[in-house]
Amino acid sequence: MLIKKNALSILKIVFPIAVLLFVIYQSKKELTNLSFKRTLMVINGLERTDLFMLVLIGLLAVAAMSLYDYVLKYSLRLSITNGKVFRVSWIANSFNNVLGFGGLAGVGLRMMFYKEHTKDHKALVKGIAWLTSSMLLGLSVFSIFVAARVLPVDEVIHEKPWLWAVVIGFALILPLSLAVSKIKDRKAGDEENADKVKNPIFAYIGASVVEWLMAGTVIYFALFAMGIHADIRYVFGVFVIAAIGGMISLVPGGFGSFDLLFLLGMEQLGYHQEAIVTSIVLYRLAYSFIPFILGLFFAAGDLTENTMKRLETNPRIAPAIETTNVLLVVQRAVLVRILQGSLSLIVFVAGLIVLASVSLPIDRLTVIPHIPRPALLLFNGLSLSSALILLILPIELYKRTKRSYTMAITALVGGFVFSFLKGLNISAIFVLPMIIVLLVLLKKQFVREQASYTLGQLIFAVALFTVALFNYNLIAGFIWDRMKKVLRHEYFVHSTSHITHATIMAIIIVPLFFLIFTVVYHKRTKPIGEKADPERLAAFLNEKGGNALSHLGFLGDKRFYFSSDGNALLLFGKIARRLVVLGDPSGQRESFPLVLEEFLNEAHQKGFSVLFYQIEREDMALYHDFGYNFFKLGEEAYVDLNTFTLTGKKKAGLRAINNRFEREEYTFHVDHPPFSDAFLEELKQISDEWLGSKKEKGFSLGFFDPSYLQKAPIAYMKNAEGEIVAFANVMPMYQEGEISVDLMRYRGDAPNGIMDALFIRMFLWAKEEGCTSFNMGMAPLANVGTAFTSFWSERFAAVIFNNVRYMYSFSGLRAFKEKYKPEWRGKYLAYRKNRSLSVTMFLVTRLIGKSKKDSV
C-alpha cells in the first residue's frame, strides 16, 4: 500500500514535467520558422477596436466563471455580499487560469475567504470540492457534442483515432456525475437537516457550460481578429480537444499543452501557422494575463495582512485534497507569495513601464512642444530615477510600511508627471494613475512604521538597481545606435551624452531619495518601551520576581518593556535594526506569552527584528511558537549550597586554599548599601587596575558604576594589612533561595587563588543566609559549533562569540567553575529563522561592547 502511494506521488510529479518536456520539444519542431518578433508586430498593427472587443470578451468570460461561486453561496447559504463573492471568484479563477493544477489554485483561496462566512466548515470543504470538480461538467457537455459529431473533429484526429477514447471518457463524466449526485441525494434524504445543502448539480452544469462557451468564444474572436473566418463548429471542436489535453496534462493553466494541440488542430484545417499562433497569444492575453493582472488588483485590495497570515499558516491550502502532493506544496508557496506580493508586483510593473518610456524614442511634437531641451533632459533623468525607485521599492512595499507607501506615491506621481512632460507615452499616462488610485484606496493596509532589511535584501536591492541601470544604458544605447539615422532630430531626445546624464542623475537621486525618507521616518518613530527607571524596577522585582539577569537592569544601559497587565518585564538594548532582549521575561510566568506577543507586535510594526540573548531551556517552546531558532551559547554554573562543604577527600583542594588564606590572615567581609564614597573609590582603583587597557563591557555583563553597585551587597577579601585585594558584587536573582554574582575583580599583586578563596567564603556566607543555590554565571561550551555535524553558520557564529575580547578567558572560566562541581544549565540565543546567525552574533557582541549611552 505504501509503495503504491509513493509511486502515485512520484507519478504526479513526473507526469506534468514529462508533458512539459514533450510540449517544448514538439513546439520547437512546429515553430522553427515562426518569428515571435513578427507576431508582436502583427498584434501591434491590429485594429484597436478589435483588441478592445477581444479584451472585453475575455474579461466577460472570466466574470462568467463567478456563476460557480454564486451557486456555492446560495447552496450553502453563506452570509457574504455578492460583490465580495465576485471579487473572490475573480481572484480564484484568474489565478487558476495561470497557476492552477486542474482548479486546485482556487480551492485554498475559496476556503480561506469563505470560512469566515459559515460555521459548517465541513460542508464548505465538500461544497468547494464539488465546485472544483464541476468545472469539468461543461467540458463534458461539449465532449458529448464532439462525440455526436455536432462539433466535427474528424479531420483533426483522423490520424490518431485513439483520441476518440479520450473524448468519450470526458463525455461520460456528465452522466457519471449525475448518477453519483442522485445516489447521494437518496442517502441524504433519510438524514436530519438534509435540506441544509441543496443539490446544486444542475446549476453547476449550467455555470460550467457558460464558462466553456465563453472561453471558446474568446479564442474564436481572436481568430476572427486575425482574419481567420472559420466555421465556429470546427473551431469549438478543436478547442474542446485542446482543452481536454490541457486538463489531462496537469500543467498550470494548460500552458503549452493546450496551445500546441490547438495549433496542430487548426493547422489540420488548413489555416496559416503564424496567424494561429498570434491568435493563441491574443487568447492568452485576453483570457489569462489581463484578468490575472486585474486579479492582482483585487487581491491587493482584499488580502489584508491578517488574512495572509491565515493563509500562510494554514497547514492545508486545499482541505480534503491530498496534501502530500509535492506539486501542491510548491504551488501553495508560490500562490501565497504572489498574493501577498500582488501590490509589490503591480508597482514593479509600473517601474518597468516608466523605465521603458525612458528608454524608447520620445515624440516631442505630441505633448508640450515648447519645453526647452535642457528641461526635457532633466525630466528624462528624473523619470529614470522614478523608474529605478519603483523597481527597488517593492521589497519594502511587501512589508506594508507607511514609509514605503509615501515613497511609492511620490515615485509614481513623479514617474507620471516626468514621463508626461518629456513626451507622450500611452502606458505611463493610463496605467500609472490607476496604480496611484489603487495605492490610495489601500492606504489603511500600511500600518508598519518601518521595516528592517536582511543583508540579502540589501544586496538584492543594490544588484537590482545596478542591473536596471545597466539595462537602461544597454537598451537606450542600442535604440539610439539603430534609430538615429531614421528619426528626425526634433523627434528624438536620446543620445549617448543624454543617456550618460540621466544615469548620473539616477545614481545621485535614488540613494538620496531613500536616505531622506529613512531619516524623516526614523525621527517620527517613537522608541519602544521606556528608559531605565531604577525605582520602578526595584519595586517590580521585589513584588513580581525576576531571574538571573534581571538585576542587570540597574546598569541603566537597557530599556524596559512592561506587559499591558503590568506582571511581566523585558530588558532590551538596540543595535542597528535589532532589538536584543536580555534573558527571559521577569515577573509572573502566566504573563510571559502576553509580554512577548505585545513586544514582538510593536517591534514588527516599527520595523525591528527581535532576538533573545541568554534564554533558558525551560521556555524554549514559547519562543519556538513565535518562529525562533536556537543556538546554544553556553551553560550557567549552579552550585547546590545544601550539599556544598569543605570536608571530605574530594574537597581537599578547596579546603587547602581556604586554610592557606586563613593562615595568612586574609579576612572575608560582606557590606550592604549604602556604601561610602571612600569605599567605592577604593574598589574603583582595584577595578581600574584589573581592567588595565581593556574597555568595560555592558548589557549582559556588569560594569563598574557606583549607582549600580549601591543596589546590592558587596563581598570582598582583605589582607593582613587591612587592604582590599579582591571584591565581587552580590547579584540578587529575586527567586527564593537563589543568589548570584556579577563583577569579580582583584588587584594585580593579589596572590594566586584569591578568587577561589573569595568564592568559597561567599558560598559559606550565602548558605548561612538561607540560600540554597548559587549562580556562578555563564561559561561557553568548548564544543559549541565545532562538531563535525554542525552547520557552517553555527561554526562561524561560535568563532565570533568565543573570540570576542571579554574580561575573562572563556576556557579559563569553565575550568575555574568546574572545580566546584556545579550543575550546568544551558543558555541559548533565540533568533529569527530568516536572519543570519553569524550577523546576529556579530551584532550581539557589538552591543555588549557599546557604551551605556549608546545602548538605550
UniProtKB/Swiss-Prot annotation:
* Location(s) in or outside the cell: Cell membrane
InterPro entries named among the record's database cross-references: Acyl_CoA_acyltransferase, L-PG_synthase/AglD, LPG_synthase_C, PG_lysyltransferase
UniProt GO MF annotations:
aminoacyltransferase activity; phosphatidylglycerol lysyltransferase activity
Q: Which residues cross the membrane?
A: 7-27, 51-71, 88-108, 128-148, 161-181, 208-228, 235-255, 280-300, 342-362, 375-395, 420-440, 459-479, 501-521
**EC number assigned by the record:** 2.3.2.3
Q: Which UniProt keywords apply?
A: Antibiotic resistance, Cell membrane, Lipid metabolism, Membrane, Transferase, Transmembrane, Transmembrane helix
Which Pfam families does the record match to this protein? LPG_synthase_C, LPG_synthase_TM
Query: How is the protein disposed in the membrane?
Result: Multi-pass membrane protein
Catalytic reaction equation(s): L-lysyl-tRNA(Lys) + a 1,2-diacyl-sn-glycero-3-phospho-(1'-sn-glycerol) = a 1,2-diacyl-sn-glycero-3-phospho-1'-(3'-O-L-lysyl)-sn-glycerol + tRNA(Lys)
Q: Does the keyword Lipid metabolism apply?
A: yes
**PANTHER family given in the database record:** PHOSPHATIDYLGLYCEROL LYSYLTRANSFERASE (PTHR34697:SF2)
Report the family membership.
Belongs to the LPG synthase family.
Q: What is this protein called?
A: Phosphatidylglycerol lysyltransferase
**Originating organism:** Bacillus subtilis (strain 168)
